[in-house]
Amino acid sequence: MKTMDAQEILRCYAQGQRDFSHINLVRVCLSNASLIGAQLIFVDLGGANLTRAQLDSATLKNANLALANMTEVCLIYADLSNADLSGANLVGADLTNADLSGAKLGGADLRKANLSEASLRGADLRGVNLIEANLTNTDFSEADLTGAYISDGAVINVVNLS
């Protein structure tokens, strides 16, 4: 797996490259970075800082984002299917229409996150914090919500829990 640093990935993105699959970006700082539409399949972003990064329509299938700081990250229409977000900080993240099917989110902090229209079908949400999250039309079918915190101001409208 090739390793890149933040400057290198941002330079390549600015030059038009969008496919960064199978790259090692462990603990990289990409806060406030704009990587809209980037292909980050099987990327290792464990412990990375993605605070306020713009990752709309990005593909992060099977990515490792465990323990990543993703506070206020923008992941509208992003594909995070089968990604590992265990213990990630997603406070205030915008995951509107995101695909998180089969994702591992155990212990993740999603307080005040926007998950409207998102798919969490078959996701592992054990112990996840969803306090004050927007869960309008969110698909939780076949998801494991054991020990999840969902009260205290969560917006729940037409949620699929089948």
From Swiss-Prot:
It holds the Pfam family Pentapeptide. InterPro entries: 5peptide_repeat (IPR001646). It comes from the Bacteria. Residues 33-72, 73-112, 113-152 form the Pentapeptide repeat domain. Keywords: Repeat. This is Uncharacterized protein slr1851. It comes from Synechocystis sp. (strain ATCC 27184 / PCC 6803 / Kazusa).
